[in-house]
Amino acid sequence: MKNRLFILTLFLIIISCKAQVIGTLEQFEECSKRPNRDQDGCPDLENITYVKDTNNRLDQFVGTWKGSANGKQYEVKLEKKINYKDDPSDVRSFDRIIGRILIKDSSGNIIYNSMNKSDKDTYFFGDNFQNRSYLMYFVGNYNCLEAGNVFIETRINNPNEMKLFYSQDKDGILNPAKCPNFSTYVPFLPTQTMILTKQ
């Protein structure tokens, strides 16, 4: 009787657990390089429910980084999130980097701060690798069309230094009433490569 009860309990546990189909960041990086990806997608990866950092490539970015550019001081805090979903209803979860940024002007005045924002509200999150660079997406002042890709990469000979490059999209519809100074607006992140040092 005990064996039957054990088998029945085990069977119910197995049925109630929804199996995760695990893929790797490397598989999704390879998918992004396929010549016909825009048309064909990556059908071999469609059933994956969790994109895992199996080789711990994200770990090199975790920590607090500081640097300066164009008279501004930057503090960037990067955290690795495991099995992360933006929304509980998302079909797929990822191991990814979530970033927070503190920017001060030359007088020490805070001009941007997402340090106390929830993970979902930092608007600075990772996507995937492109060779050695990790691709993230940043949204600053969206009313002034400040959004785009951020590429981060630690140096091979000095893993305590990281290059950060911001490529602003400038996509969207500009409403001059919400960004009256658009012609002179300077994005929060520099559009030239910036070097940050791990603290």
Residue ranges and their predicted role:
Residues 76-149, 155-157:
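Central antiparallel beta-sheet cores of small beta-barrel/beta-sandwich binding domains
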Residues 121-199:
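Beta-strand-rich cores of mature extracytoplasmic or soluble domains
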Residues 2-64, 69-71, 83-96, 166-199:
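Amphipathic/hydrophobic helical signal segments and adjacent flexible N-terminal regions
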Residues 70-78, 159-165:
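Conserved long hydrophobic alpha-helices within structured protein cores
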